[in-house]
From Swiss-Prot:
The gene is ung. SUPFAM superfamilies: Uracil-DNA glycosylase-like. Transmembrane segments: none annotated. The active site is at D64. This is Uracil-DNA glycosylase. Keywords: Cytoplasm, DNA damage, DNA repair, Hydrolase. It is an enzyme of class 3 (hydrolase). One of its GO terms (biological process) is base-excision repair, AP site formation via deaminated base removal. One of its GO terms (molecular function) is uracil DNA N-glycosylase activity. Belongs to the uracil-DNA glycosylase (UDG) superfamily. UNG family. Gene3D superfamilies: Uracil-DNA glycosylase-like domain. The keyword DNA damage applies.
Length: 226
């Protein structure tokens, strides 16, 4: 594995592509027109700020950002401190409590501590209009995040991908299963969690795969309060 590669090295060229410029221009024009777009502009690329390319150990794929006030901040499934934990994350915490010995459910939904340990919390679409789920689904973000996954697939070794729900599983279809570990389950949403997300033991499995490679396991425990 090449240690010194950065996000800029592997996906920097995407920023020069016309599709990417068009996506950014559209989002900016929507903001200028007075529409409320989440997350705020400064947070759109936070997943890449908190987790440097060579530090990626685990990838959790989300769909698009939360579309309620003060929730989204650029990390999938995560919400800002002081905001009620959303239902899918409640189920993730339930699974962690069953799966990871001693895990205590925190009183918040802020997942920055995972990101700083090498868990890339990546939504496949990076912006959304307030109150309108999937409103930015066909802008070009998907092309960009495909390139992100391709870069990890190509340049890294032994990354554990957690793909929950059909959307994430389709997105991960080209990941090389000989180089990486792919764990799949239904989405943690209340609509589907009982179909096999709860009981999937993905968090402990991810850690076992990391330990088997001589990597440090993820400490899934979050601060109980912020």
């Amino acid at each position: 594995m090449t240690q010194q590669l950065t996000w800029h090295d592997v996906i920097g060229a995407e920023k020069e592509q016309s599709y990417f410029q068009q996506t950014l221009n559209f989002v900016e024009a929507e903001r200028q027109a007075g529409k409320v777009i989440y997350p705020p502009a400064k947070d759109v690329f936070n997943a890449f700020r908190y987790t440097e390319f060579q530090d990626v150990k685990v990838v959790i794929l989300g769909q698009d950002p939360y579309h309620g006030p003060n929730q989204a901040h650029g990390l999938c499934f995560s919400v800002l401190p002081g905001i009620k934990t959303p239902p899918s994350l409640v189920n993730m915490y339930k699974e962690l409590a069953q799966d990871i010995q001693g895990f205590q459910i925190p009183a918040h939904g802020y997942l920055e501590a995972w990101a700083k340990q090498g868990v890339l919390l990546l939504n496949t679409v990076l912006t959304v209009e307030q109150g309108k789920a999937h409103s930015h689904a066909s802008l070009g973000w998907e092309t960009f995040t495909d390139k992100v996954i391709e870069a990890i697939n190509q340049h890294q070794q032994g990354v554990v991908f957690l793909l929950w729900g059909s959307h994430a599983q389709k997105k991960g279809r080209f990941i090389d299963r000989h180089k990486h570990v792919v764990l799949t389950a239904p989405h943690p949403s209340p609509l589907s969690a009982h179909r096999g997300f709860l009981g999937c033991k993905h968090f402990s499995q991810a850690n076992q795969h990391l330990l088997d490679q001589g990597k440090q396991a993820i400490d899934w425990q979050l601060p109980l309060s912020l």
